[in-house]
Amino acid sequence: MRKSISTFILLSVLSVGQLVAARPRSTNAPPRRRTPQPRRTTSLFINPPALPDLPTVQAVDKLDDALDIDNIQSDILVGMKKTKELFFFFGVEDAATFKSKLASDILPLITTTTEILSTDTQPITAVNIAFSHTGLVALGVNDDIGDTDFVSGQFSEATTVGDRPTLWDPAFAGTKIHGVFLLASNTTEDINTELANIQSILGSSITEIHRLQGAARPGAEEGHEHFGFLDGISQPAVNGFTDTVLPGQTPVDPGLFLLGESGDPSQDSRPSWAVDGSFLVFRQLQQFVPEFNQFLADHPLDIPGRTAEEGSELLGARMVGRWKSGAPVFLSPTQDDPVLGADKNRNNDFNYLVASDPDPGTENHFNQTACPFGAHIRKVHPRGDLSPSAENPHFIIRSSIPYGPEVTDAEAASSTTSVDRGLAFVSYQSNIFNGFVFLQSIWINNVNFIFGKVDPTIGVDPIIGTLGGGPHNISGLNPLIPVNETVDFQDDPWNDVVIPRDFVVSHGGEYFFSPSLSGISAIAAA
């Protein structure tokens, strides 16, 4: 918590105006000798109007349960707002030198949540660091921080989460990655300058293992992933950080993401140095965009009054659960509504058990006409399909970013991917199984989820689900089918659509721990 006893004493002696100006900040963050940096004039964030806004530092300060954002690394709470971001994976070759430089030179470079929330305090390049389990062990840190999946590493769980290990990039195979630097800025030039500085500081104490450059897509596609859909709308509101909860946004305890905070299921057993850190799941997910587009073009939904192109757009929207604008199909079932999609006060405000077009005879446990049970956003956030006590423990904060170039003309013409592109997936959680692993293995890749529906084989998530790479059936994608040559239509919500292949393929990743600044200091001193 950020408020000290002295803060509350001040309440009785200062006016409100004086208090806002003079409130002391209680933090566990260690002192840092920062070299003065040039001031920014533009934010390093993108800010699509459809996405929730970040709070100001002043707004966080006013919260009764405010988090210690001076001590929390900047990437954990901000979500999917980076313009450009580099993931630099490394191994530690000389632990003693690395820890010495970590304390003296790297710690002052680490960007806090406080710094990232204002353009005036953002560095030219934001820097975060996280360590794998083998990385912590290599640095002499052997404490049990309460996560068996973190200890096992992602490679050992590849088949558990539906991956095919033969398709993994060799860099992620095994446990040789010890850590990752996350560098975010407006330009790759600024990122490369900061990376060169870090490499100069650490010298031969580290070895580069892998790197992946991510970037927001250009122009009107900013904020959209490579299939074209606006991403990042359904982030949870974090108590102690989020000052304005939007309609439909779920407020949850910070301990779902930050170790040792309220709501952390292992709050009492975490070592003190791990408090306010978070487990970072990284995944390199290739997206086969030309093939996805061709599939939609080949299988347009045959809906009265709709062209084939519109039918293809509807199929894609029903697979995702949102139109490309971000408008949810549950609220706009048959056509896109860009105004709705851009309105953060409406685009997330719905519940699957409340009909968008109210009908007393409609019970959405048995009706997927408006939104398929297996749609991507319903699989990962089944609002109303489950009780809050069943769903809320599995929230994650996504901090992903696209990577790779736009689809080339040659790829579009041939409907064949020739250039690697996709999503650098990042999620933060305080328990890897409750977060990423549960979502991927129990919900996304489970043909029977959402449980309790009439259809016993709903299918895997049509976007990121997998059954070993082969074809899989998804029910509910086509709500109407023609019944005769006069093109009469009837409801058939259980009609299966066969998806011939995976359009998203994992090439591996790793589990990391992103410590607080005080945690980084403790690791350096271990």
UniProtKB/Swiss-Prot annotation:
One of its GO terms (cellular component) is cytosol. The active site is at D231. Keywords: Glycoprotein, Heme, Iron, Metal-binding, Oxidoreductase, Peroxidase, Secreted, Signal. It comes from Mycena epipterygia (Yellow-stemmed mycena). Thermostable. Retains 50%-90% of its activity after heating for 2 hours at 60 degrees Celsius, while no decrease in activity is observed within the same time at 30 or 40 degrees Celsius. The gene is dyp1. Manganese-independent peroxidase that is able to convert a large number of compounds, but its physiological substrate is not known. In addition to classic peroxidase substrates (e.g. 2,6-dimethoxyphenol), oxidizes dyes such as Reactive Blue 5 and Reactive Black 5. Belongs to the DyP-type peroxidase family. The keyword S-adenosyl-L-methionine does not apply. Its EC number is 1.11.1.19, 1.11.1.7. This is Dye-decolorizing peroxidase. It catalyses: Reactive Blue 5 + 2 H2O2 = 2,2'-disulfonyl azobenzene + 3-[(4-amino-6-chloro-1,3,5-triazin-2-yl)amino]benzenesulfonate + phthalate + 2 H2O + 2 H(+); 2 a phenolic donor + H2O2 = 2 a phenolic radical donor + 2 H2O. It is found in: Secreted. Heme binds at H376. Binds 1 heme b (iron(II)-protoporphyrin IX) group non-covalently. The lineage of its organism: Eukaryota, Fungi, Dikarya, Basidiomycota, Agaricomycotina. InterPro entries: Dimeric_a/b-barrel, DyP_N, Dyp_perox_C, Dyp_peroxidase. Glycans are attached at N186, N367, N473, N484. Residues 22-63 form a propeptide. It comes from the Eukaryota. Optimum pH is 4 with 2,6-dimethoxyphenol as substrate. Retains 90% of its activity after 4 hours at pH 2.5. GO terms for molecular function: heme binding; lactoperoxidase activity; metal ion binding; peroxidase activity.
